[in-house]
Amino acid sequence: MGNPLQISIFLVFCIFIQSSACGQGVGTEPFGRSLGATEASKPLKKPETRFLLFQDENDRLGCRLRPQHPETLQECGFNSSQPLIMIIHGWSVDGLLENWIWKIVSALKSRQSQPVNVGLVDWISLAYQHYTIAVQNTRIVGQDVAALLLWLEESAKFSRSKVHLIGYSLGAHVSGFAGSSMDGKNKIGRITGLDPAGPMFEGTSPNERLSPDDANFVDAIHTFTREHMGLSVGIKQPIAHYDFYPNGGSFQPGCHFLELYKHIAEHGLNAITQTIKCAHERSVHLFIDSLQHSDLQSIGFQCSDMGSFSQGLCLSCKKGRCNTLGYDIRKDRSGKSKRLFLITRAQSPFKVYHYQFKIQFINQIEKPVEPTFTMSLLGTKEEIKRIPITLGEGITSNKTYSFLITLDKDIGELILLKFKWENSAVWANVWNTVQTIMLWGIEPHHSGLILKTIWVKAGETQQRMTFCPENLDDLQLHPSQEKVFVNCEVKSKRLTESKEQMSQETHAKK
């Protein structure tokens, strides 16, 4: 039998396929009760797709837009001069809609500088089915959305290029089917997939899922792609022009599988749904965050995999290799999907600041060492103390190591570093032994770690900096010792100024 974590993941996928993959409807009210709308409270005679428009950020009622009924355009306040954003929810296990829908509606309608029509594709009666049937219904709902947009073109002369579909989980694939169902050469303006569903879509052909061909621009945010037995809640493969993988896309900070058993004891099987919901729905909250914190936009960087990104090797913005996650993404189209990685915080605002550090070590001890380091950073705005450094391998003779550091705060321009070899009882004993042996040597020896240069690149600003030891006469680093590094250019400039001043004083004396 597998370990507890594997068992938990397996249990999650069993629940996903049979009942609640997308964590829809937990702790919410049915649509009619939640909105308080007379129309919404009527029982449906048969499963159907309905469309609602919202007047402002506080609107919880919505107004039903009926294709082939042009009077509803005026009744619902549709403005043909503004873009149309349609939100498409995912699968439902209990026939209820999620509270995040109203949050994203409010965030979109609150942006006064960019007024838009905001609508909801309510396919809850078709989503509240067994997962496999709900998957089949995504194509039907996509065709319904396409029919709505074609009707808007005919009745209101509204261009499909002004349409932005935002689909969560199964809703992402509904968006794709809507785009591929549109007649003619022109395409929908934009589709955003929020952790598009994985089961029954992973590995399928582009016409069987959301793909870059479904709109002029397609972006996707992948937040729960952790696989077990070949399945993942969110689709793992790239399916857009820009595919973002926050924290690698596998799982998200603040969502803990290891606490699943405790949650089950407290909340029953709803705890499993909540655990899935945390990582899967993080895609939604990252998108909402991009609307609510336009001054704190998260940046993703193109990279081949999370391993390379964790080494800080991918913080380049040249040739469109970085982009903004969320609503304000730069809409560049390319022939091949771009995979972008980034780190986020566990809560909003999610933005962090990415730095690549490259450190040149010279190990004068014969054997590889695996010490623990911390680094303190002083910037023009903030100071961060004692950041733990993990190199991932032992330090050998002469090598440069690269790693990624992320900061929750904007510290401004980096002006000083403090690098410390954290002491431990084991390393203290090893070091003392080495020093004792050295004393018996015939010739003088120099032992320890030498730090010559630290190179830094700031991902968000693309600034490159080189830091040199403040004291060039003592480059060795020993256990419990801390070295100060300053900007080499500043240090060089100060030395030059000092020499010039000394020269002037010498001439003055003559």
Swiss-Prot record:
A GO cellular component entry from the record: high-density lipoprotein particle
Signal sequence, renumbered to the chain: 1-21
Lineage: Eukaryota, Metazoa, Chordata, Craniata, Vertebrata
An individual GO BP term: cholesterol homeostasis
Catalytically driven reaction(s): a triacylglycerol + H2O = a diacylglycerol + a fatty acid + H(+); a 1-acyl-sn-glycero-3-phosphocholine + H2O = sn-glycerol 3-phosphocholine + a fatty acid + H(+); a 1,2-diacyl-sn-glycero-3-phosphocholine + H2O = a 2-acyl-sn-glycero-3-phosphocholine + a fatty acid + H(+); 1,2,3-tri-(9Z-octadecenoyl)-glycerol + H2O = di-(9Z)-octadecenoylglycerol + (9Z)-octadecenoate + H(+)
Predominant cellular place of this UniProt entry's protein: secreted
Molecular function, one GO term: lysophospholipase activity
Domain PLAT: 353-487
Cellular compartments annotated: Secreted
Class of the enzyme per the UniProt entry, highest EC level: hydrolase
Protein name: Hepatic triacylglycerol lipase
Organism: Mus musculus (Mouse)
Protein transport among keywords: no
Stretches for region Essential for determining substrate specificity: 255-278
Family: Belongs to the AB hydrolase superfamily. Lipase family.
Ranges in coiled-coil conformation: none
List of catalytic residues: 169, 195, 280
Assembly mode: Homodimer.
Enzyme Commission code(s) on record: 3.1.1.3, 3.1.1.5, 3.1.1.32
Glycan-bearing residues: 79, 398
Function according to Swiss-Prot or TrEMBL: Catalyzes the hydrolysis of triglycerides and phospholipids present in circulating plasma lipoproteins, including chylomicrons, intermediate density lipoproteins (IDL), low density lipoproteins (LDL) of large size and high density lipoproteins (HDL), releasing free fatty acids (FFA) and smaller lipoprotein particles. Also exhibits lysophospholipase activity. Can hydrolyze both neutral lipid and phospholipid substrates but shows a greater binding affinity for neutral lipid substrates than phospholipid substrates.
Keyword list, A-Z: Glycoprotein, HDL, Heparin-binding, Hydrolase, Lipid degradation, Lipid metabolism, Secreted, Signal
